[in-house]
Amino acid sequence: MKRAPTKQPAKPAARGGERAQGRVIAAHGRHYIVAPADGGPMLQCFPRGKKSEVAVGDRVAYERTSADQGVIVEIGERRNLLYRSDQFKSKLFAANLDQLLIVLATEPYFSEDLLGRALIAAEANELKPIVVLNKIDVEAALPVARERLAPYRALGYDVLELSVKGAPDDARAQLAPRLAGHSTILLGQSGMGKSTLVNLLVPDAEAATREISAALNSGRHTTTFTRLYPLQDGGALIDSPGFQEFGLYHLTEGRLERAFPEFRPLLAHCRFYNCHHLHEPGCAILEALADGRIAPTRHALYAQLVHEASQIVR
């Protein structure tokens, strides 16, 4: 009499060599953490080939190489990609974003150049910018900070005044509705209170950071990788390491002029269609600068960015 065949155990959904879908939730060098779309445990992935174009927020296809590792073989179509660049290299921030939240503080003194560049990057990528002024409980420094931010309020930018440590409930009440359902990247210089803000909005952020750091084998570098935190009310918060420079060498002159909201209504009124808005006669931008409708600091930033862009061979 023939014996009945033994029943084989069910095979895992994504075996070695089989493609699966996921989302990149952390990046450190060429190491990436991918959260599988099927809800399985996260795994460490590496890009195929020497050059990596993977960013946090990317939807990717990967092939599993072991129980907890894989190779990224394809990057899904992106809505956008935020990055900074100089003459020699680019640094990716994140992909598929809706908003850019810039964290400033009354002290230490924030860089207005970095603020201006972050706003230009947001405009060029069609992201909604939100400016946070933290540490408003430092009352001695508050009037100067407000005065410095007044021109940006006048341009229509959201400027939220918070004290994340001193009044956390108020900070959460202001931010949570603006972040719900959106993918938001958090940018700021070191010392502005960015980490405190993340811990306020993502209660288990420290535990998640330790877990990701262990998976990346980078326990000594817990603040030097970009990571994505899902939010309780939907959406995601992407925290990027603090930085001191924000090069935008990759933006063409045409993209730059349209990234200044105060320039846009005037662009069609220049005498020359290829006006550079630097010293040309009949330039509507320069006329607005002369009569005070455009701030000198903003035009100076535009001129600097155009100069930087001219250094790149396209």
Swiss-Prot record:
InterPro entries: G_CP_dom (IPR030378), NA-bd_OB-fold (IPR012340), P-loop_NTPase (IPR027417), Ribosome_biogen_GTPase_RsgA (IPR004881), RsgA_GTPase_dom (IPR010914), RsgA_N (IPR031944). One of its GO terms (molecular function) is GTP binding. GTP binds at residues 134-137, 188-196. The keyword Cytoplasm applies. Its EC number is 3.6.1.-. Pfam families: RsgA_GTPase. It is found in: Cytoplasm. GO terms for biological process: ribosomal small subunit biogenesis. Keywords: Cytoplasm, GTP-binding, Hydrolase, Metal-binding, Nucleotide-binding, Ribosome biogenesis, RNA-binding, rRNA-binding, Zinc. Zn(2+) binds at residues 270, 275, 277, 283. Binds 1 zinc ion per subunit. Residues 1-21 are annotated as: Disordered. Its cofactor is Zn(2+). The keyword Phosphoprotein does not apply. Residues 85-246 form the CP-type G domain. GO terms for cellular component: cytoplasm. Monomer. Associates with 30S ribosomal subunit, binds 16S rRNA. Belongs to the TRAFAC class YlqF/YawG GTPase family. RsgA subfamily. One of several proteins that assist in the late maturation steps of the functional core of the 30S ribosomal subunit. Helps release RbfA from mature subunits. May play a role in the assembly of ribosomal proteins into the subunit. Circularly permuted GTPase that catalyzes slow GTP hydrolysis, GTPase activity is stimulated by the 30S ribosomal subunit. This is Small ribosomal subunit biogenesis GTPase RsgA.
